[in-house]
Amino acid sequence: LSCSIGAATHTGHARHLVEELIKKFGRDHPINVGNGSVYLEAPHARLVTGIKPKTLGDLEDIVEYCEKEIVHLLSCCHTGQEGDNIDFESKVFHAGMIDHVAMEACDMAQISTYNFPKADPEAPLVEIGIGTIDTHKPVILVIGHNVPPAVEIYEYMKRNGLENDVELCGICCTAIDITRHTQKAKIVGPLSHQLRFVRSGVADVIVVDEQCIRTDILNEAMKVNAVLISTHYKNFQGLPDRTNDPTDEIVNDLVSGKAPGACILNSEKAGEVAVRVAVAIAPKRRKMGIIPEDSQIVETAKKCTQCYSCQRVCPNNLPIPEAMKAAAKGDLKPLANLYERCIGCVRCESEGVCPNNLHPHTLMVGASRIKIREEKFKIRAGRGPIQDVEIRRVGGPIVMGEIPGVVALVGCANWPDWKANALIAEEFAKRNFIVVATGCAAMAMAMYRNEEGLTVYEAFPGAFDAGGVLNVGSCVSNPHISGAAIKIASIFAKRKLNSNYEEIADYVHNRVGAVGISWGAMSQKASSIASGFWRLGIPVIVGPHGSKYRRALLGRKDRDEDWYVYDARTGERVYVGPTPEHLFFPAETKEEAMVMIPKLCMRPSDTTKGRSIKLNHYIDLYRKFYGTMPDDIHLFVRTIADIPVTMKDEVLKILKEKGWKESKVPSPDPTLLPRMIRKRRE
């Protein structure tokens, strides 16, 4: 059900966006996602539907297919339907596959029409962080995932010469997508920054569309006298529909305070109203916020009774009472130190939690005032798809294992610490993995500087190559990551693409060393995105909150019979070890995740050089974080040549203790499909 909801959400988004863009640009507007550098431009659509979209109108057929499949998937959740667990899991995988098809159609549409970067490894660096926002200007904040209203806000500013006089900023995926359209827009941060920025009072007008928006956003906007404009029929927020009212009348009502907000379902009109209202009310509002000063924090903290109710409801179990105790004595540092680990859910401020009705999250943000002002970072604008020439360049090294793997950081902001995303990205970019990112994870990666004062996007190149760090785009850009794996099979291995999912997934699972990480996963969309990777045979690691999905897809490395493949050259069944061991793995700490990444990047097709490189990273990280050698090395060493040269003596000793025997076929042509066997041994 969770995966079907996620797929339905992205498909609904695709339907709404494609229809709006067809209305604005015409059904015959050409699809262009690479300016000549991408000829295999819709790998998911071709693989699943056999459709090669050339115009916006073609995308409607793809979305229609997704809608039909989701209806059937949702019907399977009804009482008295599927009774077999494996068949039910198959439907989960199917939902993920459909999700990637819908997201691909969605992003292709907006790249082709809104002048987003088109497979550009040198996409520009844009500003991110609360500290980048110029509070002396009227500020418009956009929140959500549907970018047309934000684009129309900017276009109205541009037409009226207000580009440099009004600040346009965003939270969540709309923020990423508007910075793909213009470098003048700024990103506040990921989903977890939503409430803290709204409560700061910096935003004069808040414009929301769909997905990942707080249900109490209207109440929070009213607390700081900000105007709320809803632009999507999926998220009215209880506001009256003013779409057909005269623009001047709407502006007058909002500026005078007669109405706290309005629902305007026409993107162009919403853009005009947002800018005009922001310019009119900014001088009067004076950025009224509800974040307390230091002296107020100290006085408020003295009322804390140390009942620990706030800590009990905190998803990250933050030591709020101890921080409040220190704050009561005038030391605000412990409270400020909680800021980066807070996900902004505000459970600690829910009704009935604190007996004295204190607001720990608000106090936390107030104590971090200086830190927040210094949040000024650079993120690379979402580049879109991977170029065909990039795939040709890295296809061989990835399949052979010489590039250790592709690490994809994706998903929501429900993490124990946002820095983990940046630390993981930095670690593996240094180790010559290819690091790609989307959405909130891509934003979090930017909000950390290394010893040289650089973010990962400034420190590493943006090309899809060893040691590269790429921001592919927003949530709907995830199919460009999974699509890269598909393109390796098609472009590098010359496998037939159209309507050939089984063979391509078999190729990816057995040959393409890739792993996804959703460190802050929490939404239904995150689960459907993950299941789309699973169906291609790509493992996914989630953070500690990922266990709340109440499922995992874990392998049993102790059961040798589970780890056999066919050698397509001979038809012989060959033991290849647990490569990869798991498909869906919840990690408790970033260290556990970092050890698991090179392990899950191992594939049966690895050459001895490639396996040696991957084992080197696995053993090195295991020793770095656990202080000892892994206990399962013998399962991944097929021949003496697989052993990293610098660790040979230690590993040979372990192999001897385990009674290891050299594999008869150390490097097979692996497949799980009997039909792929070219010649059977007599």
Protein language model annotation of sequence segments:
Residues 1-682:
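Anaerobic metallocofactor- and corrinoid-dependent redox/one-carbon enzyme cores
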